[in-house]
Amino acid sequence: MPVVPQVVVTVANRPGALARVCEALAARKINITGLDCSGPERQVRLLVSSPGQAMRALKKAGFRSRLEKVVALRLPDRPGALARAARKLARRKININYGYATTARGARRATIVFGVSNPGRAAR
């Protein structure tokens, strides 16, 4: 399971906050390939084309951010694929703290992102 860097940005819970984050990244031509902005923590989780540049752009725009390691999987877009991946982590005693996923209509694969208790062990 590949481990990738995820940018986590703390934002105010008000209209325009996500737009400002995205604009700061767009101004530096940084592509957002994954997004989660759920939960009461007021944190936006992002997979981006250039994590280091994203961190600098966000700091310059006045945001607090940090990098986290997450597991990003490309799974077949069919029933049972996610269940098998989750079971594999469970067998290794790795807890899934959160997850988000996306697939394009008609796509053959889905991208699943898990924040896990031990990214290094999940990668093996």
What are these regions (language model features)?
Residues 1-124:
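A conserved regulatory-domain signal marking ACT and ACT-like small-molecule sensing domains
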